[in-house]
Swiss-Prot record:
Residues 1096-1377 are cytoplasmic. Glycans are attached at N42, N179, N295, N439, N458, N608, N684, N878. It is a single-pass type I membrane protein. It comes from Rattus norvegicus (Rat). The keyword Protein biosynthesis does not apply. Belongs to the immunoglobulin superfamily. DCC family. This is Neogenin. Residues 1056-1066, 1160-1176, 1213-1238, 1246-1265 have a biased composition (Polar residues).
Length: 1377
């Protein structure tokens, strides 16, 4: 593969050239000059050696040696003196380009710069005499050539005119005078000075008139004009208005008012023109100039277009390549308008061909590299406002020299196993020199016959002996050679193989000039011409057409060049394409052409017509447009016709716009019934109207300035699980009532509230509890608020009451007689999405009574379902209002809803359906079917497969894979692998061999993360003979891109011993045997110590026990308050798990000596992995623990330990730091050491449960870490042997003992120490730091034997020995795990 911007592929003995910098420091820019002046076009380039600079004008090199007016400056710039420019001779104006060349290296070209020369001054408009009122605005025109505008200035009375905030010159040259004064009166003229003699315009007199009380019409003196500006320039939108009173100018952009005072880039110039500084793309749009003088408002608009010069998003990169390879120079540009791109090689334009192709819009692809392709390639982008260039260098590498090792011979039996029109498949056998060929790769070199440019295609993996060559030309001869490579290099090439691709079948090309046009609302005519490449006689054509938005395509056979399709839908868009047929079959299809049938009058009436009586003189009419299939065109309006019901001949008609779906009809008579109907309009005419719908205005206008009064009555009828509530409206009928609010609940009416329509007179409260006392309240409400409530109570019937017939409802005197007309279904059903499980359904009912005060017993049934799965059943609910809240829906699911009205025993049909899709929700189920398998041939790589969650609740946008070797670890300690949402499999590489891993997967969507899957265990396979490696290599692989998450930030590579990179590997068997021997020695030592301790404690005297029990804590928190002589002294060897060290009550020495104890560190230092041991292990960590330490220990145990370690390197580094201060026991008096306990102070703020014990340190450099507080009691806490450094096991009884440290203490001081897993007891147990215990000191042991007496009863001793036996079983389990 080609190398980009980096070091090239290196081979032994190969010398590789480096990229040579060659670039422009300064490039020429567009310049404007005048006749006779001098101009400099800057250019400077850098390279080593210095480049040679030349110039091109209009694509042709300039001969500067013999040119008197043009010369090359030392830095490479072009100097032109005495610019020549006339009507028939313009030798200096044009496009210039700087060319930099380095011999034997390459050439680059600069951007193109335009040199424009201002022409002779010509006035297109001149100032004219005018008058202006004091305080008003006026203009004086002076328009010249666009390139001469910068050279225009004005004079007043033959004196230079000074410009200020009140008098400005616009970019066009026009002079604007605002807020005119008498001093502005005079003669004005404009002058153009462009290098030659100045040119004067005609003089015009400006008269200033005094203010007048007459009204002067408001007019624009100058309107804004559309313009195009380049980003970063300034734009001035002119706008000057005049009138009496004087107008005020304001500006708007896209209907938003512009704030010209606070904006830093917007300014209002004299007269009202708008100036925009430093134009950006966001400034583009339509601007409105609005002039207002209080009597009249006028406006004018202009479009501002902002253009952006080309800018590179991605520039070409330098490339190393070898001959026959394919390369791609990438180039990505942006600009407005979109720039065009061309490529230049060493200053010459690259012409696209078979081997130089433009791919992916702007990239240059070079196929089959040859030595002459080497050089500099430049991407040149250009649009209307500028151009830019960026380049890169291509270096063709020499083939690597042959090595001394054996090279493969030529591949055998090279054949073309498959030959098609545009591809050839080659196969071969392995070389005779390497019959297996598993590690050989192959390169296929091929070229078109007669062409020197050769290309290469490599096999995808070692051992593969076939390749398919794509993108060939039909009926073309190609020459193929195959070459094998091994680790020493490329071998011999096979004999050339000559293969010719198959010729393509001669099929017709696309039919040109296909056109389609509508001839009527239901027909379209399509025409086309004969294909240019017919390849024989055209037999017939097939015309395909399809309605836009559908996927069903229809076709018809045609023998001519045109066809008219009838029976199409009105005002519907169709797409058409044509395929020509000859004797070989169908040819190439044409591009689709789209056309819409003509519009027609609507074929259906508007939908869901409803009437709302607003007051005594107005009615609001509502409707919905006809269905889209019946509109037959763009709805341009609606025609509303209405009349009094008593006089059918008197019809009033009004027309509204097509976007309006309601209309207020005013000026009606009081208490009068009116009929209404609506029809839709298109440009073709009026469609059918709806049926007449009636409504009656109120007799009088009702008051809504206050809340309604209390309802006149409230009645309740209790049933078993429901209560029927009925009421009558307030007595005062002159106050508007919008509805009623019913509150109810057991013992209180505020538990739930239901609102019903103002026309309703009863309601059934459902889903109540039997035999329960409910309090019910009723309030009328309107837009002002709720009125005074009316209270009632009722007790629902018990379950045993089977009388469910409600005679009160059946014989209700207020139930009206059913309307003999059939029930009409509800209309205007709409679904409003509220949340992920709630949708509100609303509708209208056209079958309500004509007047507003009559009520009946009708209710509505809402049904809904989803179509996934297809056999889902409908769900139903009843409602007595015109809306219903559907809850309990599934997230991200499309539902359909319909409504039916029921009154008495009659029901309507179901309404038209409405659809609504609930919002998304986070996944509520984890990914399922999680499986883990090992990748074949790669034991360190596994493949995780899964299926999406069953309850995704939305589109899955991604997954997160968690994995760890400790299933109980906190989730933030697991390693994560993100996966995109469309993937259901993922590879994880560089895992540790023969190690159990646990995997969890979590899905996410746009709302968040879902739950995790259950942990799936997978043990990586053991390494076979080919995969085995030294221990240091296995460990080192994690640091080279591996994914071992548990090493943590404290990991340090091995530095010495057997774990060093150069050490010999240690087999797992030797390591395990060494561990067993060490632990066994530790167990034997413990047994000996325990026997001695038991013997000593049996001789402890009663007097000595009382003396030890008298030890109190410093804060006086000792909880054993009995007589000291009743306290049995603790035997630390037996009561190990129930005692703790007591704090110092009083120190006999007022100035205890404190010493710093440095801790040497070697490979025996071991850090505990986790603090998740069970409770009895927690108790055994501290030999002295009583009731005082339970709280602190529980807090300590809850803290998180260090992250678990997956691998077990041992560290033999020298000490890194000193340990905290500890009291020295060597300098304390003997009496204090016998009667006092020591309180340990933790500098890290740890609890008092972290106690350390120490014994005398040996002088040997191999001593274990000793950071201990020596307890006054002569007995030591239990300790477990530690793992010694690599090498033969050594047991030194003189080594100091190290008790089991608490998790918190170890976390503070042993940061960089590595751990080794000891084993488990059938459950998760962390590795424990272990050391070899030492026997008690001789003096202490002698004192203990002298003071002790036998005081334990046989049964007590039996219990203690049983407990000791439990400890020994735990130790045995550790050694065998």
């Amino acid at each position: 593969a080609a190398a980009k911007n980096g070091s090239p592929p290196q081979s032994a003995g190969a010398s590789v050239r480096t990229f040579t910098p060659l670039y422009f420091l300064v490039e020429p820019v567009d310049t404007l000059s005048v006749r006779g002046s001098s101009v400099i076009l800057n250019c400077s380039a850098y390279s080593e050696p210095s480049p040679n600079i030349e110039w091109k004008k209009d694509g042709t090199f300039l001969n500067l040696v013999s040119d008197d007016r043009r010369q090359l400056l030392p830095d490479g710039s072009l100097f032109i003196s005495n610019v020549v420019h006339s009507k028939h001779n313009k030798p200096d104006e044009g496009f210039y380009q700087c060319v930099a060349t380095v011999d034997n290296l390459g050439t680059i070209v600069s951007r193109t710069a335009k040199l424009a020369v201002a022409g002779l001054p010509r006035f297109t408009s001149q100032p004219e005499p005018s008058s202006i009122y004091v305080g008003n605005s006026g203009i004086l025109n002076c328009e010249v050539n666009a390139d001469l505008v910068p050279f225009v200035r004005w004079e007043q009375n033959r004196q230079p005119l000074l410009l200020d905030d009140r008098i400005v010159k616009l970019p066009s040259g026009t002079l604007v005078i605002s807020n005119a004064t008498e001093g502005d009166e005079g003669l004005y003229r404009c002058i153009v000075e462009s290098g030659g003699p100045p040119k004067f315009s005609d003089e015009a007199e400006l008269k200033v008139l005094q203010e007048s009380e007459e009204m002067l019409d408001l007019v624009f003196l100058m309107r804004p004009s559309s313009m195009i500006k380049v980003i970063g320039q300034s734009a001035v939108l002119p706008c000057v208005a005049s009138g009496l009173p004087a107008p005020v100018i304001r500006w708007m952009k896209n209907e938003d008012v512009l704030d010209t005072e606070s904006s830093g880039r917007l300014a209002l110039l004299a007269g009202g023109s708008l100036e925009i500084s430093d134009v950006t793309e966001d400034d583009a749009g339509t601007y409105f100039c609005v002039a207002d003088n209080g009597n009249k408002t006028i406006e004018a608009q202009a479009e501002l277009t902002v253009q952006v010069p080309p800018e590179f998003l991605k520039q070409p990169a330098n490339i190393y390549a070898r001959e026959s390879m394919d390369i791609v120079f990438e180039c990505e540009v942006t600009g407005k308008p979109a720039p065009t791109v061309k490529w230049v090689k060493n200053g010459d334009v690259v012409i696209p061909s078979d081997y130089f192709k433009i791919v992916k819009e702007h990239n240059l692809q070079v196929l089959g590299l040859v030595k002459s392709d080497e050089g500099f390639y430049q991407c040149i982008a250009e649009n209307d406002v500028g151009n830019a260039q960026a380049g890169a260098q291509l270096i063709i590498l020499e083939h690597a020299p042959a090595t001394t090792g054996p090279l493969p011979s030529a591949p055998r039996d090279v054949v073309a196993s498959l030959v098609s029109t545009r591809f050839i498949k080659l196969t071969w056998r392995t070389p005779a020199s390497d019959p297996h060929g598993d590690n050989l790769t192959y390169s296929v070199f091929y070229t078109k016959e007669g062409v020197a440019r050769e290309r290469v295609e490599n096999t995808s993996q070692p051992g593969e002996m076939q390749v398919t060559i794509q993108n060939l030309m039909p009926a073309t001869v190609y020459i193929f050679k195959v070459m094998a490579q091994n680790k020493h290099g490329s071998g011999e090439s096979s004999a050339p193989l000559r293969v010719e691709t198959q010729p393509e079948v001669q099929l017709p090309g696309p039919a040109p000039n296909i056109r389609a046009y509508a001839t009527s609302p239901t027909s379209i005519t399509v025409t086309w011409e004969t294909p240019l490449s017919g390849n024989g006689e055209i037999q017939n054509y097939k015309l395909y057409y399809m309605e836009k938005g559908t996927d069903k395509e229809q076709d018809v056979d045609v023998s001519s060049h045109s066809y008219t399709i009838n029976g199409l839908k009105k005002y519907t868009e169709y797409s058409f394409r044509v395929v020509a047929y000859n004797k070989h079959g169908p040819g190439v299809s044409t591009q689709d052409v789209a056309v819409r049938t003509l519009s027609d009058v609507p074929s259906a009436a508007p939908q869901n017509l409803s009437l709302e009586v607003r007051n005594s003189k107005s009615i609001v009419i509502h409707w919905q447009p006809p269905s889209s299939a019946t509109q037959n065109g763009q709805i341009t309006g609606y025609k509303i016709r209405y009349r009094k019901a008593s006089r059918k001949s008197d019809v009033t008609e009004t027309v509204v716009t097509g976007t309006q779906l309601s209309q207020l009809i005013e000026g009606l008579d009081r208490g009068t019934e009116y009929n209404f109907r609506v029809a839709a309009l298109t440009v073709n005419g009026t469609g059918p109207a709806t049926d007449w719908l009636s409504a009656e205005t109120f007799e009088s206008d009702l008051d809504e300035s206050r809340v309604p009064e209390v309802p006149s009555s409230l009645h309740v009828r209790p049933l078993v699980t429901s209560i029927v509530v009925s009421w009558t409206p307030p007595e005062n009928q002159n106050i508007v009532v919008r509805g009623y609010a019913i509150g109810y609940g057991i013992g209180s009416p505020h538990a739930q509230t239901i609102k019903v329509d103002y026309k309703q007179r009863y309601y059934t409260i459902e889903n109540l509890d039997p035999s329960s006392h409910y309090v019910i309240t009723l309030k009328a409400f309107n837009n002002v608020g709720e009125g005074i409530p009316l209270y009632e109570s009722a007790v629902t019937r018990p379950h045993t009451d089977t009388s469910e017939v409600d005679l009160f409802v059946i014989n209700a005197p207020y139930t009206p007689v059913p309307d003999p007309t059939p029930m009409m279904p509800p209309v205007g059903v709409q679904a409003s999405i509220l949340s992920h499980d709630t949708i509100r359904i609303t509708w209208a009912d056209n079958s309500l009574p004509k007047h507003q005060k009559i009520t009946d017993s009708r209710y509505y049934t809402v049904r809904w379902k989803t179509n996934i799965p297809a056999n889902t059943k409908y769900k139903n609910a009843n409602a007595t209002t015109l809306s219903y809240l559907v809850t309990g829906l599934k997230p991200n699911t499309l539902y359909e809803f319909s409504v039916m009205v029921t009154k008495g025993r009659r029901s309507s049909t179901w309404s038209m359906t409405a659809h609504g899709a609930t919002f998304e929700l986070v996944p509520t189920s984890p990914p399922k079917d999680v499986t883990v398998v090992s990748k074949e041939g790669k034991p360190r790589t596994i493949i995780v497969n899964w299926q999406p969650p069953s309850e995704a609740n939305g589109k899955i946008t991604g997954y997160i894979i968690y994995y760890s070797t400790d299933v109980n670890a906190e989730i933030h300690d697991w390693v994560i692998e993100p996966v995109v949402g469309n993937r259901l499999t993922h590879q994880i590489q560089e895992l540790t061999l023969d190690t159990p891993y646990y995997f969890k997967i979590q899905a996410r969507n746009s709302k968040g993360m879902g739950p995790m899957s259950e942990a799936v265990q997978f043990r990586t396979p053991k390494a076979d003979s080919s995969d085995k490696m030294p221990n240091d290599q296995a460990l080192g692989s994690a640091g080279k891109g591996g994914r071992l998450p548990d090493l943590g930030s404290d990991y340090k590579p091995p530095m010495s011993g057997s774990n060093s990179p150069h050490g010999s590997p240690t087999s797992p068997l030797d390591s395990n045997m060494l561990l067993v021997i060490i632990v066994s020695i530790g167990v034997i030592t413990i047994v000996v110590v325990v026997i001695i301790a038991v013997f000593c404690t049996r001789r402890t005297t009663s007097h000595q026990k009382k003396k030890r029990a008298a030890c109190k804590s410093v804060n006086g928190s000792h909880k054993y308050k009995g007589n000291c002589k009743d306290v049995k002294p603790p035997d630390l060897w037996i009561h190990h798990e129930r005692l703790e060290l007591k704090p110092i009550d009083k120190s006999p020495d007022p100035n205890p000596v404190m010493t710093d104890t440095p801790i040497p560190r070697n490979s025996q230092d071991i850090t505990p992995v986790d603090n998740s041991m069970d409770s009895n292990i927690h108790q055994r960590r501290n030999s002295y623990r009583g009731h005082e330490s339970e709280d602190s220990m529980s807090t300590l145990a809850g803290r998180r330990g260090m992250r678990p370690k997956m691998m077990m390197p041992f560290d033999s580094q020298p000490p890194q730091q000193s340990v905290r201060n500890t009291p020295s026991t060597d300098t304390m008096p003997a009496s204090s050491s016998q009667t006092c306990c020591t309180d340990h102070q933790d500098p890290e703020g740890a609890t008092s449960s972290s106690y350390l014990a120490s014994s005398q340190e040996e002088d040997s450099g191999q001593s274990l870490p000793t950071a201990h507080v020596r307890p006054s009691h002569p007995l030591k806490s239990f300790a477990v042997p530690a793992i010694p450094p690599p090498g033969p096991p050594i047991y030194d009884p003189a080594l100091p003992s190290t008790p089991l440290l608490s998790q918190q203490a170890l976390n503070h001081h042993l940061h960089s120490v590595k751990t080794a897993s000891i084993g488990t007891l059938g459950r998760s147990r962390p590795p424990m730091p272990v050391v070899v215990p030492s026997a008690p000191e001789v003096q202490e042991a002698t004192r203990m034997l002298e003071d002790s007496e036998s005081s334990y009863e046989p049964d007590e001793l039996t219990k203690e020995m049983a407990h000791l036996e439990g400890l020994m079983k735990d130790l045995n389990a550790i050694t065998t795990a």
